[in-house]
From Swiss-Prot:
Residue numbers covered by the propeptide annotation in the UniProt entry: 23-48, 65-67
Lineage start: Eukaryota, Metazoa, Spiralia, Lophotrochozoa, Mollusca
Record-given protein name: Conotoxin LiC33
Family: Belongs to the conotoxin T superfamily.
Gene Ontology MF terms in the entry: toxin activity
Modified residues (Phenylalanine amide): 63
Intracellular or extracellular location(s): Secreted
Organism (species): Conus lividus (Livid cone)
Amino acid sequence: MRCVPVFIILLLLSPSAPSVDAHPKTKDDVPLASFHDDAKRTLQRLWIKALCCYGYRFCCPIFGKGK
């Protein structure tokens, strides 16, 4: 009888069938993967600019012609 409550709790914690999104997608909805890709690209550009400007000011977009 001790196993019954544990079994019921495990059943409640187990993943259920995938839910269906109740809201229809609109043109304003952006997939999360796309958002993460954009954020990753932006961070990579900023990182490259930071490395470039740190040692070589001539390649920095603020001080020179580089991007």
